[in-house]
Structures are given as structure tokens and as C-alpha cells.
């Protein structure tokens, strides 16, 4: 029985449909590393690779070689952007080739013959002038040097000429002003170029209106440095640089819509040079800036997504930007526009505050969460609740299109990152479904109706062979096609760039074996996948289409957009090949609120209402001085809605918002008025926080002004613009417990939360990795870091702890070496460990680790030991000390405190972590049993220690000691130096200037010990690292011009005294700044003792402490900015709403009111380098609803006109001068004359450049007494000499022999040692060694080393003696005897011709005789002089004894002085004051009077009574 024919036809069609597959061909002849470039609206493909240029006109089935590569230069290809269907250029073999007919024919472009092209950089095409091309190449000039050259062609690339802009430059970037056919610039061939030099302030912006024949310079504004430009259809955007010395400098944007007039755009936050990734234009002429705010060049999140950590969107005139982030916590986000779907954006919140993905389909006005659904229950990964099923997309910035709302993306559900899948959306990204269970590369065809995907892992389906999957119904169903090769896919593209075609090329690298991990890059696999015969080539009819409305049919910028797309189930080809995706547009009749934006004077609040933008008004000054009415909203540019809404005007109060208005402020300010150098004004930005601000710290980098702030409520905030804007770190997350910064890696910080998590950032808080800490109680102890490995650190936790007071609770040290991914217990009972090997310069191992270990068996005595390891305790540790009190690492030293039997402390020091030496304390320390000491620092080559000599009833003071260079022996610098209960000492080194130290001493120590008085403090200062001390010289007048009232004008009764380190609320608030060289600010008083804080005034010095000025009555807080170019003060401990500031190094002061209401300013902070123009005020206030704190960011950048010019080639015409620290230009400090750099103009700011690097050492000086300090156990006398401490005998140096059994000899100390900082040369030499002495018991070895044996005696003495006797006899025989003998010796005179000279020998002998005669006469005369001096001395002595001494006026000669100096110091060698013995015979030196300091006299080469200056050169 036959089946009906109609049934056979149906069965045939069904079977054909079921068995249909695309035509897949393996292509041959394609280079393994070739680029595949399809022409638009064409079947022609270019393959450009190592072998050359191949062309295929049949979708790659057959290839023809057109150009062969010789391999001399890199190969590149560029398709003509505006004629992509026919024109392309290829750079090959150092030449440029072009085609005008899809690669069928190629021509060589002609260039000037004097240059050899080596690399193509850019080729740019005009959308309107089709025959004009501009190109940039690297070429060799006549000297064979490679440089960048720019060319222009006016004949469609056949020939090029040099683009001569008439400017010298290092590089140049040129573009056509019109970048597309939709450009709003004039439709012509105008060319915009920017020339670049090594200094951005010399860059030029140039415009040509005649195809590059001539250029004119465009003016952006006066004193504006810029380094880049961006083009959109409506705007030319210039990126200007505020600081030309900083690679990560802040930038401003200047915008022009006509390439003539430029206006500065308002930015809501600071931007850096590295922040801007790209600028695109959205509907309504709005610009969108994607930002990558990180020090890393390609920061990625856990999914591999590049982090656009924020976005900025402008209003429709391009001049006012607002943040595009939508997170309630302002978390870091990735924001990506879907460019072929107008108004559609996808946003991913990244990091701790991640809220998943959200989407906007109305140009960013509203946002909604991406919705995932599992229709048909196909996904093996399930969610308990579909509402909690978060879709995480993998690469949201890559969309294959264009399509009519059909999107394909990779991603995963919730946290299942390892289970990547392929997802499909058919409504423009609002709703998503799983397409494939595995990740793959993909492409769309027929405008999204056909989808091709290839698994990234060929074995994802348990089959080692590669395959492709394809869908013919927009991703609803999928079919598999098995391929013949095993390979790793690299890319799949639609050969038709507009997405309309049905042919694809799949490329990859083959795998030799199924288990290969690395593909063979020399064996490329290329497939052609052809879908042109799908559905038998049937074209869709009208019934097969549906309407897809963009934005769900809502109006976007006044219009509705509708796509006509194929139905999902239709069995036909929906589009036409080479026909672009089109949409229908319908103008909206009624305008809606979303068609409007806030007027420039307004900004949307949290409820979406336009309110007055006071920050914008203050920053720009764009309003008159009187109140005005302004519409709060305006229609967005290019909006097409017809019937506008009635917009009400709102009052804008502009009082005090535009202080730069010339009507309000005179151009030359009077005293007390603000300076008006710049075009803007000081800006203040407020932020408030619930609770008290308890932590704040800047990252110590110049990349930006990032900081972390935490409150008493456990909330943490991150700012990258010095507190203008904040990110809430733990929004709706666990409270913050502790914050630690890495002292060695300035971009790293660690945040502990109360749930046992550690959040780590290595990019200044832009991104964080979350680490689960080992199970333990957080004790709030600091982390210990490896100084050379940021991934290695030690964490301390409490084990067996129910609470911190639990008796079973003990500290455990955990170490991680992989950045916290894993932790291991370092050592049982280790309570304090440090990576000393990574910080000690002399250590043999960077991994040397010291640990203080608690002995659990001696809990009552709290015994601690010190152990070391170099293998992280994999082997048995080395016990360094059995008992210690503690240890600390300070610079180049590790100092260990070891307990003695009678509660005294012994300190040991090491510089390499292996050899330890007991510190030798001076004999005159006045401390019977040292019970406490403080290590004060070691930055100048010596260790400073404070040993406590008295501590009772919260009163403490002690001796200040300084070590030699290896930290072992100490001398006492000062007694009774003030200390507090916590061990902090009134000791501070002036930052940036070596050897200047301030300290407070207790002047009534005896009364305090007796209990009869309170502390009386006075401040002393040293300018030579502690050798000489003096009280601070006070100013003559106070800030009111009145004299100070002191009992005496002498310095010992009337000096400046300052409150110091022990009284500070924040120990970071130092007198000085390392960038404001020579400047110090302090609170104190003039008198014979330091008064209470509230009775003091505020003082300033700009010359390192030599002279001071009272700048304010009362106590003020202070901060330095811009290297001292800005000084700001705020009342300390009082409610205030203003600050005082100076821009001329304290000569004049101005007040700035930052608020109407008064607050308590608890601190003023800025970046650690003190180089910024912004300051952060930490404020507090008690209000009705509880305690509230805040910050005020005060920005001075608008106050200055320009950046200071630093030009060493033209120093008389820049903004800097060199100055010296000290009273005299000829003054030497530490053996050299130094000059420092400081700006000389108020109108400019310095920026981030380190001025200290330009410090000039003019020359080294000859050594004087000021270059030496007393040696160990020697004490300085009133006359400046160093004498042995009373009660000691010389020769104690022999003790060194006991410590080193191999030593044979030792040397006695001269009593002096050279200051480590001194670089003096020649002159006085006080630290020379004595003659060697034998070590006890080593006399024999000493004699062998320095003694003379019999044979040596014969050679050294007897042989020369025989020679001398023989020579003497010869001279006597040939000279003296022949000429009459000794009888004529007294008659011989130089120049006489009486001597016998018959030959040359006689002449030589007679010359010797004449020299001997002359020498004898000099010796005889010298004997007479000595006899007269002896007689005169006897007479003077007897005259004094008899009371008949009279003034004597003698002409003291150089030699006479030396002789008398020897007499003066004779017999005092043990007191180390024999200065004459240390002087080089041929050295010149000056001896002059010096000012006597209080208690400590400067050294005098003359007696104190004389005032004469004796110069050895006279």
C-alpha cells in the first residue's frame, strides 16, 4: 500500500529540516597569526599576517596572495572607516600599500624620499572629504634616528606629504574634527592636531582649515597645560593637567562645540590622568566618561571584568558632569552602554557593596535589576528562590551585534563562578535565560536570528573533539555540529560587519593531544561556517515579523524607537544581507519629566528633585551677586517632544558664591582680604557621619588623594579626592573593627570586620579582596609586614578565647605568604614577630625573622625569649636571647631590651641580625638602675635613646643619648629631657633638614625630686645633630607689635618654649614638614618656662628654627600644603566656622569662613607629602539626635592663577629661588654648604614635584670643631673640648680585646668622633687614631707585627749606615779636605767662586757643601730664637707672680701660635683637648669667635676673654 504523496512530501521536508546543518569548510592558506579583515557589504576578506596579504573574494574558500612580507618591519592593516566596502591600507616591508577595489589591486603610496618608514601608528579618514587622509608613522630621519612623523594625503592615499605645523615637537596626534557623518561640527575636512613635548605646558593645540597646508594655534586659556584631546560628534574635549610634574596629576576638562571657544567643565570629583578610559556621546548630546580608577593598568574583578569603577555623565551642553553610579552606597561599578540600543546601559556593582547587575533602558534615568528565569527548568544550577537568583555577567562591555534586542553573554548564577554558562536575552537585556550550559565564544547573524557558539573547552561535553553549537530561533533551541579538528577557539566573527550576513569564520589553535594544556600557535585552524541555505533560503514575509519596542515603548529623548524583527519561531531568513539594522522612530507628542534635565544651577537630590547646587555655584561663580530666579529644569538638547511642560522658576541665592566677581573683591587685596590670583575661589565640601570619626589616614602616594575614614559606629568610608566624595565601604555589611596600613607598600591597606574577615586593597581602596581570617579572636594588634613582599604578613589572633579577659586566651601568630589566601600558625606562643631581614641593610637573608616567644611555664614571671629563623621555622629556631623585655626595629638597627638581676635594663643592638653587641652607656649617665628607655630614631646614621632617670607620680624625665654609627656606644647629649607616662619624649627632628632637633628639658629637676615643685619646661634646639644645644631665640615683637616682657633679655632667661610631642592629640601633627623645607609651626610662649597650652600663642619659623615669628595670639592647629605655599590654621579646642591661611610663608594671613554654623575642628590633615591644595578638617558636634561628626574639604586650587615654572636653564625667569638655612650665606652645615629651593611667587602653586631633590650642595667645607662630637665616655666642656668623664682613667678601650680574642692591638680614643652626617674634608682632624697598643696577653704577637728581627735590622739600619758613611767620606775627601778642611767651614758663602771645581763631580760635591752650610746657619739662628722665647716666658711668669703684668700687644704669627697652642694643651692628652696634634700640616683653617649657648658653649680656639680673630692665612 502506497503512502499518500502529500505525506511523503511532508516527511521529506520534516527530515530535511531535522537533519539540516550549515556548510562547514576547513580553510587552508591562512597564516597562523593573520588578522582576518572582512570588507563591509562584500564577500571579500583580507588575511594580513606574517607571510603577507592574501585576498579571498568568496568568503575565504579560496585565497590569492597579493603582497609578500619580507619580515623587516611590523605588519598592520587599516580599513577605511567611511568606505569599508572597498578601501584599505596595509603597512608592509616599510611601505604603505592601498586598495580601492576590495583588494583586487594594490598601489604603493608615495612618501618623501628622505625618510624610511618603520612602523605605522594611525591612519585617519574624513567622513566628508573622501580623498583626504592623515597618517602617523615612525620613520628614520637623515641621521638614521627613529622619530614620529605625520603626513597628509589629498589624493586618496596615493601620495603623502609631511604635515608641517610649524612647531617643534616630540610627538603629534592629528585627527579630523568630524569623526562621523552625524558630526555637529562643520562638514568639512578640518584637521585638529596636538603637539607634545616633554613638558605638557609646552604642548600646542592646532587647527587647519585647508587640508593641512597651514595651522593656527587654538587658545584654551592662559597658563593651561594639556596633554590629550577627545572628539565626539558634538564636542572637542581637552584634558588639561594641573601638575606637570606628576604622572598621576589631577586633570580638568575644557569643552568646545565649535573648536574655537573653550569652557571649563565642572566635575563632581577629581579626575586623574590615568582615570579616563574613553569618552562617548549619548542621546541628547550628553557625554559619558568611563573611568578606571586604579593604579593597575588593567584592573579586573573576580570575573575578569575590567573595572570602570565609575562613570560621569554630562548635561546636554557638555559642561556639567555628575556621577553615573546608582548604588546607594556609591560602590565601585562597571558601566557599559549597549551602543546599538539607544539609551541602554548595563551596570555591575563591584566589591564589598555588590548589588549584582542592573540595567537602564531610558538613558540612565531609572535602573532595575537584571531578571533571570529558568523557563522549562533547563538549568542544572538551581536557586531556592528565583527572586534571589542573581545573574553575574562575565564581560559586559562586549556585545556582538547589532541586533534587534537579542543579546548573548557569558555569566554565572550567584557565586558559582566555576560554572560559567551562556545566557540569552530577547528584550534588550531586561530578562535573561540560559542558552548553553557551558561558556563559549559566540557571534550572531541575520540580525540576531542565527547564533553560533563554540565551547571554550572542547571537552566540556565529555568529547575531546571540538564542535560548534548553533541556534536558528534566537537561542531558544540549539543544535550541535561536530568538527574534525581538536583546537582551542580564539574568535568567531560574522563576515558581514553589519550583522546581516549568514557566514562566519571560526579561528583557533590546534591541540596535538586531548590533554594538551597549551595549543600549538603555529598550527592555526580556520573554519568557514555558512548558513546561507538555512530554511532553503526562504525570505520572511510580513506575517513572520513582530514589533520590538525599545525601552518597552517609552519615549527616549522625545521619540519612540521600534524594530521590525523576525518572530522567534519563524522558519525564514529575517533580513537582507548587507542591509543595516533599521528602526522606526515616532516623535512623542507630550513632553515628560524624563525629557528634562536640571538646569546648571541645580542638581537632583536623593528624591530626584532639582535643588540648588551650591557646590557648583561656589566652584564656577556662574551667577550674579544678587538673588535671581532660574528655571530648575530645561529640555534636553535635541529632544524631539512637542508639547513642553510648564517649568517653575526657583530662587538661587548667589551671595558669597562668586567672591571672584571684581565688584565684590578688589584686584589688589588689602590686609585681611583674600588674594585673588586665580579665576576661582576656595571651595568647602561637607560630609557628615553618625558617630565620632575615630580613624583617618591617607595613602602615602602621589597618584591621588585617597584616604580611609572610620567612625565609632563601625562604619568605614573611602575617598579618592581628599574627602570631597566618599564610598561607604561596609554599607549594610559587618562593622569595621580595625584598619591597618602597610608601611612599606603605600597603596596597600587592610580592614578587619567583626565577623572575622580581612579586606585587602593594593590600589588605594579602589578594589578589595576579602579574606577569611583563621578562627581566632581579633585582638586589635597590628599586622607585621615583609618590607619586600606585599603578600607576606603576620596576623595575631586570640586562641581559646571566649573574651579578651579569658584566662585561657593567648596570642597566636599566623603567617600568610600568598596575600591571605591561606594562613598557617607561625610558632606556638609567639606574641611579636618582625621580618627584620627585609629591613636591615646588612642582613644576609631577607627572610630573617625575629619572634618574641612567651614561656607558658613561667606565667608568673612573664618570661619572654627572642628566637630567629630564616626558613619560617621549618627547622628548629635559633635562640637569640633567653630573656628579653622586648625589642624593636628602627631603620638599620634592631635594639633588644634584656632584663638584669636588679630590675635594670641592658640594651643590645645588631645591624645584621646575627652579631649582637651590648650598648655601652656613658659613665656619667646619672642612672643607677636603668628601668626604661625609649628609642627615638636612627635616620641620621646614629641611634637616639632616652633613658629614664626619674619616674614618680606621673612625672618622668631622663637623659638623651646618641650612639656611634653602629649603635653600640653612646654619649649623653642632654640631661632631664622631658618624658610622659607612656614613654613618649619631647624630641623631634626637623623633617627634610639633617641635624636640627628640638627637645624640652626639665629645668627644675632637683625641686621635682624633692616633691617641692611642678615641672618647668624649656625648649632647646640643636643645628648639628646634638653636639651644641641652645635655647630658641625669641622674636623681638609679638603679633601685635608689642615687646615681650621678660625678667632679662638674656637667652637663659628669655627664650621661646614650645609644647611638644608628649602633649599631642595626634602624633602625626609635627612641627615641620618634609616638603616645606625650613618651616615649623608650634604653640608656645616667650619666657623662662613653658606656660599652659591655653595661655600660649602660635609661632612660625621659615629658616629651620634660627628665627621665629608670632603669627597668632592663642593656640591654633596647623597644617602645611603645597610645600609650604599654603599654611592653614584653626582654633584649637574652640568652636569655629573659619580658618586662617597664608600664601606668602606666613607674612600675611587671611580668614576663610567655611560654614555658617560653628563646629569643633579636632584636626587638620592633608596628604603625607604636604604637597596638595586640599585640606581635610575633622569636625565634631553634638546635636539633638546624638553625636555627629564630619569632614570639611577645603580646596585652594581655584585660588592660584597657574602652576609655578621651574626652569633650570633660565633660573632668573622662573618662580623659584634658592635659599640657605642659617644666619650666613657662608655657614657650613655638616661639612657642606647647602641651598634649598622655594617658590618666590604667590600667584602660582608648586604641585607634586619633590623640591628636596633639587637641593644643591654647593661645596664641601674644611673640617672645624662643629664637625666633631665627643666620643664615648667623654664629656663636652665649656670651652668646647671633650674631656674624659671624671672618675675614669684612660685606656678602657682595651676592653675590646676581651670581646674579640683575635685582636692584637687596640687604639686609645682621642675623645672625638666625626658626626656621621658631616662631609667635611681636610682642616681640623680630631678623630685621628693614637699609636697602636698591644692587647693584654698579645705582647708577643704585637711585637711580631710591629717589631724588627735581626735580619730586618741589618737590612733597615746597617746597610743604609754603610752607604751613609761611604757617601760622607767621599764628600769630605773631594770637597772639604781639597778646599782647606773644616778650618774654612765658617768662611764658605753661597755664590762664591773660591771652591775647586774641575769636573761635574766637583760641582755636585760643592753644591752639597753649600747646602749644608746654609742649613747649619738656620739651625743656629733657630736655637737663638728658642732661647729668647724661653727668657720672655720666664719674665712674663715672674711678672704675673709679682703682680706687675701689663697688656702686651704682640704680632702673633702662624708658627708662633702653633708653638704656644702646644704649650697650652700640653699634659692634657687624656682629656682629648690637644687640638694641635690633630691638624694636618698643610691645612688651612679659620679660628673665630662663636656665640656662647646656654650651658653649652661652642668651641673656641682662643680663650673666652679674647675677641680677636686669628686667621691662619694672614
Curated annotation (Swiss-Prot):
What InterPro entries would the database entry show? Sortilin_C (IPR031777), Sortilin_N (IPR031778), VPS10 (IPR006581), VPS10-sortilin (IPR050310), WD40/YVTN_repeat-like_dom_sf (IPR015943)
Carbohydrate-modified residues are 54, 342, 416, 746, 966, 1260
The membrane topology noted for this protein in its Swiss-Prot or TrEMBL record is: Single-pass type I membrane protein
Biased segments, Polar residues type:
1505-1514
Q: Where is the composition biased (Basic and acidic residues)?
A: 658-674
Pfam families reported for this sequence: Sortilin-Vps10, Sortilin_C
Q: What is its main location?
A: Golgi
Give the Cytoplasmic compartment stretches of this protein.
1373-1514
- Which sequence ranges are listed under topological domain Lumenal? 20-1351
An example Gene Ontology cellular component term from the record? cytosol
BNR repeat coordinates: 55-64, 151-160, 359-368, 423-433, 469-479, 717-727, 814-824, 1099-1109, 1141-1150
Q: Which controlled-vocabulary keywords does the entry list?
A: Glycoprotein, Golgi apparatus, Membrane, Protein transport, Receptor, Repeat, Signal, Transmembrane, Transmembrane helix, Transport
- Kindly state a single biological-process term from the GO annotations of this entry: Golgi to vacuole transport
Q: Where are the transmembrane segments?
A: 1352-1372
Signal peptide as annotated in the record: 1-19
Region called Disordered, residue ranges: 651-677, 1480-1514
Cite the SMART domains for this sequence: VPS10
Extent of Acidic residues compositional bias: 1480-1491
Task: List localization entries.
Answer: Golgi apparatus, trans-Golgi network membrane; Prevacuolar compartment membrane
> Which CDD domains would you find in this protein's record?
Sialidase_non-viral (cd15482)
Family that this chain belongs to: Belongs to the VPS10-related sortilin family.
Q: What does this protein do?
A: Functions as a sorting receptor in the Golgi compartment required for the intracellular sorting and delivery of soluble vacuolar proteins, like carboxypeptidase Y (CPY) and proteinase A. Executes multiple rounds of sorting by cycling between the late Golgi and a prevacuolar endosome-like compartment.
Question: In its UniProt entry, what is this protein called?
Answer: Vacuolar protein sorting/targeting protein 10
Q: Which gene encodes it?
A: VPS10
